[in-house]
A protein has these predicted regions:
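Residue-level signal for well-ordered, solvent-exposed loop/turn and beta-edge residues enriched
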Residues: 35-36, 220
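Conserved PLP phosphate-binding loop immediately N-terminal to the Schiff-base lysine helix
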Residues: 210-223
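PLP-dependent aspartate aminotransferase-fold enzymes
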Residues: 85-207
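Glycine-rich loop-to-alpha-helix module at the N-terminal edge of alpha/beta enzyme cores
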Residues: 7, 36-125
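Short, acidic, Ser/Thr-enriched surface-loop or helix-capping motifs
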Residues: 31-32
Length: 232
């Protein structure tokens, strides 16, 4: 057991009191004590359709037998193009290009690179500053940690984080939002902090703003009404 170093886990305590899952089916895990445990996190949001769905298993098996892997350098499989097209058709009209990555961390770091690269090729090389949000989680890559706002994830790596990052305040205020149904009505004014940050640094230096629609890892914080689409 000591060979595996678990992430985001106090390993010394875990080895004394291990939680071992042996199987999963539908919305449940089954541990080594025979207990049936409801998976309230959907496999850390990676299994939203449940575990061990035979239809998904059959599709994976069929694809593996046809083509298990095709490098994306100078070539691609027909299935990859078909999947990209399906994703683009389901996305908002302005999001019509797909770039595949292996994880959320890789996706965030890639998105930051795309933002900076885009501005550079457009002749705006000064646009390198990123804006994230307090308490945000954007993965474990250095870019994601930099734009993220979780202190415990950042404090040991300050010298390695990308420069030029600022953070918006988070939207949680229990005194105003407790027991709200749906999106809270209070808090839209917090979006105005973005204008202050842009004015502070000059709009010509901003490369991108990155926000989680719902801040998951810090408590499933639902944004307030009009936060991401403030009225003019």
């Amino acid at each position: 057991m000591s060979a595996y170093w678990l992430p985001f886990t106090p390993n010394r305590y875990f080895h004394q009191h291990p939680k071992i899952m042996q199987s999963a089916k539908g919305a449940y895990y089954y541990d080594d004590h025979g207990r049936k445990l409801f998976d309230g996190l959907s496999g850390l949001w990676c299994s939203p359709l449940g575990h061990a769905d035979p239809r998904i298993g059959a599709a994976i098996s069929k694809q593996y037998e046809t083509m298990d892997y095709c490098p994306a350098f100078q070539m691609a499989s027909e299935d990859t193009f078909r999947l990209a097209t399906r994703i683009a058709e389901m996305a908002p009209k302005s999001l019509d290009k797909v770039f595949f990555t292996n994880s959320g961390s890789e996706a965030v770091d890639t998105a930051l690179k795309i933002a900076v690269g885009y501005h550079r090729v457009m002749g705006n090389a000064s646009r390198i500053r990123m804006i994230g949000r307090d308490r945000a989680y954007h993965g474990v890559g250095m870019g994601g940690i930099s734009v993220g706002g979780m202190v415990a994830n950042r404090k040991m790596f300050a010298s390695m984080m990308i420069p030029g990052v600022d953070h918006l305040p988070h939207t949680l205020n229990l005194s105003q939002m407790a027991f709200s149904k749906g999106m809270p009505a209070w808090g839209a004014h917090l979006a105005e902090e973005l204008e202050k940050i842009v004015a502070l640094h000059d709009a010509n230096t901003i490369a991108a703003v990155i926000l989680e629609p719902v801040q998951g890892s810090t408590g499933v914080i639902v944004p307030c009404l009009l936060y991401t689409s403030p009225s003019p």
